C-alpha cells in the first residue's frame, strides 16, 4: 500500500487525478470504478479541467459506481447517479451510455442482479474510494463479516448521521443502499483512496494499525497488490503518521 501525503487538498486532487489521467491516456477504453461523497469532488473537477484544456479524452471510457441509495430515482438530487452527472459526467466527453450506477427504484432483486452482472463483466482498472468515519468502504458497513458481492445493506446510524448533511433532514436519508461487495472492490487492478481530514479514526486503523478488521472495512486495503492512499499533511500530523 502506497501512502501519498500531500500539503493540501488541491495538491492531493492533482496527484490523484494523475493516476486516472495516465490510465485513460494509456488505455482509452479503460473501465473506471467511481465513488461519490465529498472526498473525490476536487479530483473530478481537475479531471474535467484536463478534459477541457489538456485533451484528456473520456469518449471511449466506461465506468461503474460503487453504490446507490435504494428508493431514490436517478433524477433525485441526492441520488448517486445525479451526483456523478453533476460533478463529473456533465463536464467531460464521456458517453453516459457507458456509465453505470445501480438503479435505486424498481424491483430491488432485479436491480441487484443487474448490478452484480455489470460488475462481474467489468474489468475495473482503477477503483476510486472514499472512506466513512467508521472505516466503511462504499456501503460495506462494519460488522463481523463482509460480503464478497454486491448486496443491499442496511445503513448504520453513524452513516445515516454523516450523510444527513446532504438532505433536508435526517428523516429523509434512505436507510438502505446497494453496494459493491468487498471482494469486487478488491478485484480492481488499482485502488485509489482519498481520505479527508475528518476521518481520523479510520486513518489510524488503516495507516497505524496492523489488523485486517471487518469492523473497520478499509483496513482490507492493506491486502491489495496496488493500493494508493492520498491524504493531506494535516491529517497525517493529527494521527502521527510519519511514513
Regions inferred by a protein language model and the residue ranges of each:
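Ligand-binding beta-strand-loop-alpha-helix segment within the catalytic cores
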Residues: 56-127
